[in-house]
């Protein structure tokens, strides 16, 4: 860059401010990659929701594998004294604003799917009361017109996707798998099942 570390602080008020902007830029980069993948899939498939969901998840995995350090900064162990995302929707939090762009790509798919093809979700009285209260709080923060059970399903999908990608990025599948690509396909099939979609057995793209 042709710039010393001290010179960077002429543009940022503190180390945390610098990290916030780095994280925000990274979130914006991921969101752009995912959005482009969704658009390509929608065009190629004529708007098939399974294809769009698969493309979004694959784009997230591909970015994470190509940028493991950046993935670790956003989604790994927080740096001492620094939290990448301070809170959802904080208008004064640059990185939260950028993180919303990232999560918004997945949420937009989820909202579209729910509006076009609602899928079975647990009723409120089938959800643990403590969990239900948290789901309602998160739903209200999103401003989403969804039942709590649908929010639960969204989070279950994210946990599966994030868990699989994290295990692969950080090398925690090496004890059993040299190439986790097919395992990732099984994860996508699980997500599709939760969302009432069919994931064809030949949807996978092989190694890598």
Can you describe what each PLM-predicted range is?
Residues 1-17:
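Helix-turn-helix
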Residues 50-53, 57, 95, 99, ...:
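Hydrophobic packing residues in well-ordered alpha-helices of helical domains and bundles
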Residues 104-208:
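C-terminal peripheral helix-coil segments that are non-catalytic and often amphipathic
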Residues 41-50, 89, 173-177:
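Short, surface-exposed loop/turn segments at secondary-structure junctions
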Residues 82-120:
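A contiguous pocket-lining binding segment that forms or flanks enzyme active sites
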Residues 34-45, 78, 82, 168-172:
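Secondary-structure edge/capping motif, primarily at the C-terminal ends of alpha-helices
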Residues 17-37, 55, 59-62, 73, ...:
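Alpha-helical structural segments
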């Amino acid at each position: 860059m042709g710039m010393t570390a001290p010179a960077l602080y002429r543009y940022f008020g503190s180390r945390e401010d610098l990290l916030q902007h780095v994280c925000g830029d990274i979130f914006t980069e991921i969101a752009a990659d995912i959005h482009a993948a969704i658009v390509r899939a929608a065009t190629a498939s004529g708007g098939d929701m399974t294809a769009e969901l698969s493309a979004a998840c694959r784009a997230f995995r591909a970015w994470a594998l190509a940028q493991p350090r950046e993935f670790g900064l956003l989604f790994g162990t927080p740096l001492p004294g620094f939290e990448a995302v301070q809170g959802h929707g904080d208008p004064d939090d640059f990185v939260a604003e950028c993180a919303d762009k990232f999560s918004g790509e997945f949420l937009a798919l989820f909202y579209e799917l729910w509006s076009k093809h609602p899928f079975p979700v647990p009723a409120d009285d089938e959800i643990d009361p403590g969990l239900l209260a948290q789901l309602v709080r998160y739903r209200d923060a999103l401003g989403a017109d969804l039942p709590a059970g649908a929010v639960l399903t969204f989070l279950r999908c994210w946990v599966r996707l994030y868990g699989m990608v994290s295990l692969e990025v950080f090398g925690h599948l090496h004890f059993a798998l040299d190439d986790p690509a097919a395992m990732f396909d099984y994860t996508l099939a699980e997500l599709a099942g939760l969302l009432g979609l069919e994931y064809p057995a030949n949807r996978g793209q092989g190694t890598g």
